[in-house]
Amino acid sequence: EEGITAYCLTGAYGMPSPTITGSVEKDIMMVPPIIGTKIAVSDHRSSNPRGEELIAIGSATRRGGMLANVAGLVTMHMGSGVGKLDPLFYALDHSDIPAKNFLPTHMLRTHDLMEEGAKLVRRGGYFDMTAGSTDEDMELGAEKIMEILSWEGMSTDHLTMSSDAFGSQPKFNAQGECIGLTYCSPKYLHLTIKSLVRRGLALEEAIKLLTSTPAEMLGKAGIKG
């Protein structure tokens, strides 16, 4: 009734990807809400996939997407590991998979990831940024977004923002031990847009992060967003 459309991804942090039908490609083809695959990269909770593994999962995801007429997007949970986007750039350099078929997320996690994301955008890709889980995190994230938009070749046409809302948010101590779980709120999407506008970004540009740019990336331009 409210016009909300929901999609989902097959896979998980680990590889090989858990699936419903036995393969990533079949999941995307046979299960209508599935539009892509989820993996984790450069994170201590991932399977530490390398470039060749990204080529394999990217190829299967793209094929499934083409056959099902959906985005065929590999959403990459990015950690703060030393590998950064190296496996992705290897995949792009050693295959014919377009950059737009990979979406790294949590890209405000480190400044190195922000810079790597800018390189990806300059190659025709997109990257996603996570709205904060606290007021302080949200304001820091807005500041980082404004910095990114000041860089050459960067615009809201290739950046998206999501909230991780109601997904688990682990808390780690200084030794890297998980000491608890919480969750993020979707309210920080709205609050981040307000903060960006207060910082001087035009409203029509700020809301692209949540509307037309995700729609374009998902192949839904003119339908959603």
Name each model-derived stretch.
Residues 1-64, 78, 85-90:
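Active-site loop-helix segments enriched in His/Asp/Glu that coordinate
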Residues 43-172, 177-179:
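Active-site core of metal-dependent hydrolases
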Residues 13-14, 134, 210:
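Conserved beta-strand edge residues that scaffold enzyme active sites
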Residues 151-225:
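His/Asp/Glu-enriched, well-ordered alpha-helical/loop segment
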Residues 5, 126, 202:
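Residue-level detector of anion-binding/catalytic polar loops
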Residues 24-32, 91-95, 99, 183, ...:
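Short, electropositive alpha-helical surface patch
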Residues 1, 117-120, 196:
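Generic structural signal for hydrophobic
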